[in-house]
Amino acid sequence: MQVTDVRIRRVTAEGKMKAIVSVTFDDEFVVHDIKIIEGQNGLFIAMPSRKMGEGDFRDIAHPINSSTRTKLQDAIFAEYEKMSDMEEEAANE
């Protein structure tokens, strides 16, 4: 399965969540509402989840092995970095 499209919507409110992402795989399957969050050790992705009962959350969709998670993170962070660079260039003009 290959990542064929990454669409990022930056979150403008202050806080730890930086953006919401939609990722398309093989031009056939899309996962919406992946979050980019700034944690103590830098940025990480949080897969879409649903609240279950008393404050517990359960992922709706997620990679089942670390290599797939790494490929997904790399694709998302590359696009996020590209978007951040373009915003910075536009601000400096």
Swiss-Prot record:
* InterPro entries hit by this protein: SpoVG (IPR007170), SpoVG_sf (IPR036751)
Keywords for the protein's UniProt record, in alphabetical order? Cell cycle, Cell division, Septation
Which N-terminal stretch is annotated as signal sequence? none
For this protein, the record's Pfam families field holds: SpoVG
Tagged with keyword Chaperone: no
Give a yes or no for keyword Protein biosynthesis in this entry.
no
Superkingdom, natural source: Bacteria
Q: Which PANTHER family match?
A: SEPTATION PROTEIN SPOVG-RELATED
- Family statement: Belongs to the SpoVG family.
Name this polypeptide is given: Putative septation protein SpoVG
Primary gene name: spoVG
